[in-house]
């Protein structure tokens, strides 16, 4: 996958957790296009979260290289926490803090490090995000929130500084279908309005693929496939044959083209339509993993 101005370029990255006898990641090479919705796919334990943690600078020792664009790179050569909204699995909460107090903690962190920070604009943005996410009163204590609302608060916190990049690990975990739809729309609107880039892991592929522009399928630490979602149809072209009448069972050689199939059936007096079958990220995932 090539991009003239990628936001991140990962080359031959391998990583092994201490005391483990197997690599969590092995020879991973990817490019994250700027402005993309990058879907990181794979079964549990595939290495998706490990890769996100590496991008976030959680592990300093690994082999290979990770190159980041200047506008998202921090002083330590890893992602700048100011330019990036990060939501990893199982974030800690402070049960005695209200939503407002919890978010205020991070607002203070951002305000101290972003020279152009405008507190009034930030407050307006946070209020708008809270409304879009249908959160309860911001005076509600974190410990009294449902798991779904805690997840929404974490997304609010990640989006509070108007980041250029979102890294989201299972952003719709513990959410009901309507809330999941709200979250996907919020991320899509942010991308369109801000030109941001999102790197997202989610097990609910059928929902995520509606917004995904690029993808990588990882299993057992290896990248099995990656590319642009728009290219899937041309790379995995198959055809559906709709037969009107009875067709005797038999083997169909792979070399048969749609035209040949249509001609053979027509010669046998069978009317049929041969049309491209709809290819999708979900289908490619099922065929790959």
Question: In which residue ranges do the predicted regions lie?
Answer:
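Conserved ABC ATPase "signature" region
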Residues: 104, 108, 119-137
């Amino acid at each position: 996958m090539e991009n003239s101005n990628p936001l991140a370029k990962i080359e031959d990255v391998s990583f092994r957790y201490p005391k483990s006898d197997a690599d969590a990641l092995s020879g991973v090479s990817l490019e994250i296009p700027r402005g993309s919705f990058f879907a990181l796919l794979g079964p549990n334990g595939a290495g998706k979260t490990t890769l996100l943690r590496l991008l976030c600078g959680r592990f300093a020792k690994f082999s290979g290289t990770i190159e980041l664009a200047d506008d998202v790179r921090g002083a330590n050569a890893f992602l700048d926490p100011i330019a990036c909204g990060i939501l990893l699995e199982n974030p800690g909460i402070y049960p005695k803090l209200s939503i407002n107090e919890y978010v205020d903690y991070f607002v203070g962190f951002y305000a101290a490090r972003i020279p152009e920070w405008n507190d009034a604009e930030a407050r307006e943005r946070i209020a708008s995000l809270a409304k879009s996410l249908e959160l309860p009163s911001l005076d509600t204590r974190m410990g009294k929130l449902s798991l779904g609302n805690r997840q929404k608060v974490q997304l609010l916190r990640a989006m509070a500084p108007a980041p250029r990049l979102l890294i989201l690990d299972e952003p719709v975990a513990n959410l009901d279908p309507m809330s999941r739809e709200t979250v996907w729309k919020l991320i899509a609107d942010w991308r369109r309005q801000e030109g941001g880039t999102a790197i997202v892991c989610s097990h609910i592929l059928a929902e995520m693929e509606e917004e995904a522009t690029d993808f990588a399928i990882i299993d057992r630490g290896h990248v099995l496939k990656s590319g642009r979602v728009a290219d899937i149809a041309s790379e995995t072209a198959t055809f559906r044959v709709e037969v009107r009448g009875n067709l005797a069972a038999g083997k169909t050689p792979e070399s048969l083209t749609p035209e040949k199939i249509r001609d053979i059936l027509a010669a046998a007096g069978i009317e049929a339509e041969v049309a491209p079958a709809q290819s999708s990220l979900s289908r490619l995932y099922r065929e790959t993993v």
